[in-house]
């Protein structure tokens, strides 16, 4: 688990991802020991991540995590990397905060915690974020964290995305 000031970023193993796939919210609550909002499972790319784990179980720490508000013991979003860093040390981060928990700094806190963890791992040199050009909140977040746009790409699911990169470690001056 990765912890920050308010969040625990709990890795979703194959058992938890299987519960997400079938939409078993009570089972997830028992497995994770937290309150799982009914809309949360729909935000998790569970089938894709299950396939990645089946192919390489060592990917687990780099994949999807529940974003848990520690005080409330409630899931407020999902975050993680798309997989281990590539051969150039680039790891792509992803995040989604549930609508009722937005505008509280959870995404920023999660990305900073993941970046610190990735840097400490020694395997990642660069953090990548791909953002839809219409997602103003996410664009504002990555820019505020010092990410720089390096291009764009066409995602088969999400359409056009702007690609941003930020070297590790993060050093944010006030």
What are these regions (language model features)?
Residues 1-92, 96-100, 117, 121, ...:
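GNAT-family acyltransferases
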Residues 101, 105-113:
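Conserved acetyl-CoA pyrophosphate-binding loop and the N-cap/start of the following alpha-helix
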Residues 105, 122-123, 146:
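Short glycine-rich hinge loops at helix-strand junctions in the catalytic core
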Residues 108, 133-151:
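Conserved active-site alpha-helix within GNAT-family acetyltransferase domains
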Residues 111-114, 118, 126:
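A short beta-strand-loop micro-motif that forms or neighbors metal/cofactor-
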Residues 127-131:
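Conserved hydrophobic beta-strand within the GNAT/NAT acetyltransferase core sheet
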């Amino acid at each position: 688990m990765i912890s920050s000031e308010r969040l625990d970023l709990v890795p979703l193993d194959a058992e938890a991802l299987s519960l997400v796939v079938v939409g078993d919210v009570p089972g997830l609550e028992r497995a994770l020991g937290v309150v799982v909002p009914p809309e949360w499972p729909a935000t998790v790319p569970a089938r894709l991540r299950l396939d990645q784990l089946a192919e390489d179980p060592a990917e687990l720490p780099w994949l999807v995590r529940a974003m848990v508000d520690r005080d409330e013991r409630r899931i407020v979003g999902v975050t993680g990397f798309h997989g281990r860093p590539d051969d150039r040390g680039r790891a792509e981060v992803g995040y989604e905060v549930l609508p009722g928990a937005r505008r509280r700094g959870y995404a920023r806190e999660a990305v900073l915690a993941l970046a610190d963890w990735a840097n400490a791992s020694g395997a990642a040199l660069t953090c990548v974020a791909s953002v839809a050009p219409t997602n103003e909140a996410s664009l504002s977040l990555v820019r505020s964290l010092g990410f720089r746009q390096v291009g764009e790409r066409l995602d088969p699911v999400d359409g056009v995305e702007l690609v941003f990169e930020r070297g590790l470690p993060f050093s944010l001056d006030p």
